[in-house]
Amino acid sequence: MPLLLTGKKFHNDLKTNKCLAIFAPLEGGYETRLLRRMRAKGFKTFITSARGLGDPEVFLLKLHGVRPPHLGHQSVGRNGALGEVQQVIPQASELFNENDKNKLLWLLEGQVLSQSELESLIEICTNDNKLTIVVEMGGSRKLEWKPLSNYILDEFES
């Protein structure tokens, strides 16, 4: 039985563009196949949701503070009016433990991201030459992808 998806064209497009917008059939399966193919080609992969991402550069790459949810009346004198700020490690920190591998960050539900957030993802890719990002931008009848910069031009500039 021949392979339905070898990942060669996807790998070549990912290497040249570094940031891709992907449209996959809603029944799934293509994402994990492509991730497996990229791992076989030497990529270290990390998959996460784009929901609640906030500032992508800070949330993915830098140490940042997160306030816990407000749970009713609390003492103002202990933590100030805004509450205690807990320091959280970057979400994609496990990608950056190894410097020798190519890194692939796969973001699910990317259709919730704004134009500026997508542009900052492209900027992150250009700053780190070993990092590549794939953003799932919704469903399609067949698997297709295009550079994220082209997606931004098509979607937001019209």
From Swiss-Prot:
EC numbers: 7.1.1.-
InterPro entries: NAD(P)H-quinone_OxRdtase_su_N
Top-level taxon of the source organism: Bacteria
GO molecular function, one term: quinone binding
Subcellular location: Cellular thylakoid membrane
Entry GO CC: plasma membrane-derived thylakoid membrane
Swiss-Prot/TrEMBL catalytic activity: a plastoquinone + NADH + (n+1) H(+)(in) = a plastoquinol + NAD(+) + n H(+)(out); a plastoquinone + NADPH + (n+1) H(+)(in) = a plastoquinol + NADP(+) + n H(+)(out)
Annotated TM spans: none
Claim: Cell cycle is one of the keywords in the record: no
Membrane topology: Peripheral membrane protein
Key words, A-Z: Membrane, NAD, NADP, Plastoquinone, Quinone, Thylakoid, Translocase, Transport
Family per similarity comment: Belongs to the complex I NdhN subunit family.
HAMAP family per the UniProt record, alphabetical: NDH1_NDH1N
Role played: NDH-1 shuttles electrons from an unknown electron donor, via FMN and iron-sulfur (Fe-S) centers, to quinones in the respiratory and/or the photosynthetic chain. The immediate electron acceptor for the enzyme in this species is believed to be plastoquinone. Couples the redox reaction to proton translocation, and thus conserves the redox energy in a proton gradient. Cyanobacterial NDH-1 also plays a role in inorganic carbon-concentration.
Subunit: NDH-1 can be composed of about 15 different subunits; different subcomplexes with different compositions have been identified which probably have different functions.
Protein name (record): NAD(P)H-quinone oxidoreductase subunit N
Native source organism of the sequence: Prochlorococcus marinus (strain MIT 9215)
